[in-house]
């Protein structure tokens, strides 16, 4: 099976936790499948970021290039929101491949992403529309928070997100429950915990 893994580029130099999970998955999958990883960089410049939140034509073209290059049977996305946009999910679905996204956090339902506000756990937007995050400026300020809120709201309420993705992988029962309570189809969300590297080699006395 040909599998294409897509990760949204980050703005930091050090690998993130998601990057570590992706490499671990790649090592496991390559034992039985042909797997390729591609990174799509976040857009540069405020205007490109804002106008590409809902639908990025640049990222749509980039993903189509990778689809033509690898002809995958499965496209597995990791970070999609906010900057890759629904356009990449649509491109993958349109190609005929099965589309999977790993839910590492709550970015589709919590504009902060990690269910935190003011340094404390917050679940006010779980099961709701997410407007509380705008009121509290959970992402930088009210303007940015509103933009992120609208992306998530449109993606879920229009059903585009659920129509474009065949299966969501939640990294924990908590993440799955939060998304199902927020409108994700329960039948589409499965739990696969992150793998943990364990060294079983005993030290010699």
Residues of each region from the PLM?
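A short, charged, and often flexible helix/loop element on the N-terminal side
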Residues: 39-64, 77-79, 136-150
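Carbohydrate-associated surface elements
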Residues: 174, 195
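Short N-terminal targeting/anchoring amphipathic segment
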Residues: 5, 66-84, 97-107
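A short beta-strand/loop micro-motif in the catalytic core of glycosyltransferases
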Residues: 100-101, 163-173
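N-terminal subdomain of nucleotide-sugar transferases
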Residues: 1-43, 68-70, 88, 95-98
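Membrane-proximal helix-turn-helix segments that form the acceptor-binding/catalytic region
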Residues: 61, 65, 94, 107-110, ...
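Nucleotide-sugar donor-binding and catalytic loop/hinge architecture
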Residues: 1, 199-205
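Histidine-centered beta-alpha loop that forms part of the nucleotide-sugar donor binding/catalytic region
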Residues: 8, 103-106, 113, 127, ...
